Amino acid sequence: MNSAPKLNTFQHLIGEHQTFLEAKRIAKQFSLSELPVLITGKIGTGKNHFAHAIHLESSRSNEPFISVNCSTHSEETLIHELFGPNGNTGVFQKAVRGTLFLDDVWRMPASVQAQLLKALDSDTEKPRMICASADRSVEHTFRQDLFYRLNILTLTLPELSERKSDIPLLTQHFLSNSGQQLLIDPSVFPVLEKHAFEGNVRELKNAADYMAAVSSGGTIQPYDLPPYIRGTIDGKTSKKKAKLLTLMEKAEFLFILETIKVLNEKGEPASRRIISEHSKNTQTSLTPQQVRSRLDYLEKKDYVTKSRGRAGTKITFEGLSFIETLKNQMI
């Protein structure tokens, strides 16, 4: 049971995609009603957050919001949790003037369904019922008379794959909550947008937490992404391009890219003059003019991005993949 969740008003539900805004609009309308709400959506789409937002916007906002996950309790424990040892001291009674949120409701055992139906059919005061489920495949096992008591106002939440344009906004929001002052390089977003995110917004938050933890500079770079997300990008194209280069060109590009990577990780500028200085004590000595021409090539291939001023040159995710390709071909 959770009776004191973190504040989740509609203002705290982040997103600008039309499908998400429509879900918020419908949810706000539902908050004006006393009828039961059924929220459906995949794992990590924010069912708990929407349920709490509906409660906080409703006339019951000053009363308890109590959440119970029906899939994490045994049959006996769930009955005890909902109705208490003597049938009238459980959370159903405690939430009577507020909202009772039943998560993963289709997983509720048959005996508990019968007792819940009996409580809803009684003449006594009842809580506002909000239910949620991520798995509709077990819906047919739910008793129909109770199903139609709970499934009156239905809200379906969009998956993150349906609103990929919200990924930059959500990522920046999660990073801002990390307690660190972090920026995010624009080259990170295309990589995130190519990932499937089967865990939806929850998985994206986990990725943002990972990036905040491993980042050594003030700006999140593609190499700060979780390995399982970096690994979703296909490196076949870079392998084909590398085969067309001479051995000397491969050595020069490898040196330049590795130098840029190190400078990026340290938060130091990667200008052609600095790269040239680093090359003087190596077998790959390059003048600033030579570095410039090599950087022009790398930029055309999307291996680096060049910026004016202190920011200098940044390596991209494709550039990181190209480093590994060059290393393998030079063994």
Curated annotation (Swiss-Prot):
ATP binds at residues 95-104. SUPFAM superfamilies: P-loop containing nucleoside triphosphate hydrolases. InterPro entries: AAA+_ATPase, P-loop_NTPase, RNase_R_HTH_12, Sigma_54_int, WH-like_DNA-bd_sf. GO terms for biological process: phosphorelay signal transduction system; positive regulation of DNA-templated transcription. Disruption phenotype: Cells grow much more slowly at 15 degrees Celsius. One of its GO terms (molecular function) is DNA-binding transcription activator activity. Induction: 8-fold induction by growth at 15 degrees Celsius. Residues 12-213 form the Sigma-54 factor interaction domain. Transmembrane segments: none annotated. Pfam families: HTH_12, Sigma54_activat. Keywords: ATP-binding, Nucleotide-binding, Two-component regulatory system. The keyword ATP-binding applies. GO terms for cellular component: protein-DNA complex. May play a role in cold adaptation. This is Putative sigma L-dependent transcriptional regulator YplP.
